[in-house]
Design a protein with these regions (language model features):
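A structural signal for the main folded, soluble domain(s) of proteins
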Residues: 1, 9-12, 31, 261-266, ...
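Active-site-proximal beta-strand elements of phosphoester/diester hydrolases
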Residues: 1-9, 115-122, 232-238
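Structural motif
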Residues: 4, 40-41, 118, 216
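Core catalytic region of metal-dependent phosphoesterases/phosphodiesterases
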Residues: 5, 10-111
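Histidine-centered divalent metal-coordination motifs
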Residues: 9, 85-86, 120, 218-221
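Short, well-ordered, mixed-charge alpha-helical segments that flank or form enzyme active sites
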Residues: 88-92, 118-119, 125-128
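Conserved beta-sheet core of the metallophosphoesterase superfamily
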Residues: 97, 101-105, 122, 127-140, ...
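Active-site-proximal loop/helix segment associated with metal-binding centers of metalloenzymes
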Residues: 121-200
Length: 272
């Protein structure tokens, strides 16, 4: 079995009872380890992750999570970590601490006879997005893409890594908290098949003959399972702090979406 999950946002100042949140995530991974061959984490497992040039004591809060990931590694379960927009600032530390394989870009894999496109989902837009959206939405997208470019700038990353961890973390965690509270106060539900950026992106890829059987994304914090073509489906994974949704691919190439409820799973109810 191959499992897919995303968006735990560990360490978030907007999530109450952080230790209970981390414990439930560990329970979820333990459940997966019973039959997992590999596990794909599609980004934003941390609300803020930065690897500084000096030791960062704040990362001790994630010790139980790291311990569980090392246990998975010892069992021979491969854990692949695709970075998102909250945790892209890893420079070898996660591989060393947690024994995961980090990937910084979307990837296409073939498993059990099926081709899968995996990505966190931030920054993926159809080519003609400027024609599709009204000015207010276009402006919002441009602002996000500018911010994304800043976050990925190697020189600016270097400067931030030079900060004392207590300074960098104070800013980073509070910025992430502000983002999370804004999302809670003004949630952005499923926009519909003709407006949801990731749906349009996946459909465009199919039109360009870049066929995949499954597209799997995180980022949007909505649970979506959509048939975009007769032989192609896309899934947005939801999250691992409120919805607790994940997907799994069995040895026959069947992809299903489930909800974790503290030791057991059930079929997820999807956005329409």
């Amino acid at each position: 079995m191959i499992y897919f999950l995303s968006d735990a946002h560990l360490g978030s100042l907007a999530i109450e009872r952080g230790w209970a949140h981390q414990k439930k995530l560990i329970d979820m991974l333990e459940m997966m380890s019973e039959d997992a061959v590999s596990i794909y984490m599609l980004g934003d497992m941390f609300d803020f992750w930065m690897e500084y040039f000096v030791h960062d004591k704040a990362k001790r809060q994630y010790s139980p999570f790291f311990k569980e990931l090392r246990k998975l590694h010892k069992k021979g379960i491969h854990v692949h970590y695709l970075t998102g927009n909250h945790d892209l600032w890893t420079f070898g530390g996660l591989e060393q601490i947690a024994k995961v394989e980090v990937q910084y870009e979307p990837c296409t894999i073939v498993r059990y006879g099926k081709t899968l496109f995996l990505a966190h989902g931030d920054g993926l837009l159809p080519e003609n997005w400027e024609e599709l959206y009204p000015p207010k939405v276009r402006s919002k997208i441009r602002s996000f893409m500018r911010l994304r470019k800043i976050f990925r700038n190697p020189f600016l990353q270097f400067l931030y890594r030079c900060l004392p961890p207590e300074v960098g973390n104070k800013f980073g965690y509070n910025w992430a908290k502000k983002s999370r509270l804004k999302e809670i106060e003004n949630p952005c539900p499923y926009k519909g098949e003709d407006k949801e950026e990731l749906v349009l992106y996946a459909k465009e890829q199919e039109k360009l003959h870049n066929h995949r059987d499954y597209y799997i994304f995180g980022h949007r914090h909505i649970d979506l399972d959509l048939q975009i073509k007769k032989d192609s489906r896309m899934v947005i994974l939801g999250d691992c702090f409120q919805q607790w949704t994940y997907a799994k691919l069995d040895k026959h190439g069947n992809l299903t979406v489930h909800t974790f409820e503290g030791g057991e799973e059930k079929e997820a109810d999807h956005a329409q």
